[in-house]
Amino acid sequence: MKKSKCVRISDLIPKRDPIMKIVMKFGGTSVGDGKKIRHVAQLLKRYHEEGNQIVVVTSALGGVTDRLLENARLASTKGKVSLVKEFKTELTNKHHGAVRDAIDDPNVAKEVLQILDIRIEELEKALIGICYLGELTYRSIDYISSYGERLAAPIVSGAVRSLGVSSIEYTGGEAGIVTTSDYGNARPLEKTYELVLKRLGCRLDSHVLVVTGFIGENEDGIITTLGRSGSDFSASILGAALKADEIWLWKEVNGIMTTDPRIVPEAKTIPQISYAEAMELSYFGANVLHPRTIEPAMREHIPVRVKNTFDPEFPGTLVVAEKFQCRHVVKAVSLIKNVALLTFRELKWQGQSGLWQGSLQHLQGQE
């Protein structure tokens, strides 16, 4: 007699495909304090409930990374444990205040505060160690600066959970970002892409995943940082690994502008631009995207969208592989400040040859 197959009720319910798989990065302005984190959490809840699979990359709270680096340098030069204690109080007050403003659920808030206190204690010990050693290595700088994101991620994840959405927080290393040991400017190893997919891919359907931007770890498990625009780079790495539909970089501007709106108020948003054009603008002074940021996205042909956290309905700028034909001849104008252009015109009179070589040799020794 043939045995009947057991069928679960859940198997009979048609599964809805996610609308999109999106990696969203929120910068320091977007998560600057608890009220802004609450706003971010509400955005994430909305996109998640629409059926999207969401991975969040968070930067540190506003100004925290600079203060971490400043106090690390003070610890190495002044060696005063009292200054470390003062900084610990400052950091605790800032992040506890953010929890109060971002998280309503008292049980979630309690859990997050416990995580923060443990991490701040770890940081304090590291800074006191630097006081006694009187030196600050590149490895130590990476370790200290990583705490900005490592303190922000639990608050962002907690704010999402406080709104009734399941969320898990990861450090970059826990998410699978394995890098070279070039402290301060590490690069992801090829194994990163497989590890990220293995560790995060299975949880995308049911959770909003929050990952620290800017940091990874080397093959020995030591914390590394990804350098300038590291959180954008983290988002691009995760997006490439997870084969995301889009990578969204949430900033305080309405996308990539035709020029700097602080200089030209009439500047407009560029609706679409190619990877190559975006990289060229970055090289020539536009600060919205760092060229290295979009390398992993380019590898998988994943569109990168630049959006405004505080105007979320605005579509922003979409950065894609193909060049978008625009009716305007010039798409954008960028500016590099404090650059001098020297023109040498050498008249080859007798005894005057080599003038420009001598001039350049002289300039080489100047600041």
What are the roles of these predicted feature ranges?
Residues 3-294:
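Nucleotide/pyrophosphate-binding catalytic subdomain
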Residues 219-220, 258-259, 305-307, 315, ...:
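Short helix/loop capping segments that flank catalytic or ligand/cofactor-binding pockets
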Residues 246-248, 303-306, 311:
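Internal nucleotide-binding/catalytic subdomain
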Residues 251, 306-308, 345-348:
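Active-site proximal loops enriched in glycine and acidic residues that flank catalytic Cys/His/Asp
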Residues 289, 300, 312-317:
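Surface-exposed amphipathic alpha-helical tracts and adjacent flexible/coil segments at the periphery
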Residues 297:
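Acidic-aromatic/histidine active-site loop/patch
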Residues 315-367:
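A conserved regulatory-domain signal marking ACT and ACT-like small-molecule sensing domains
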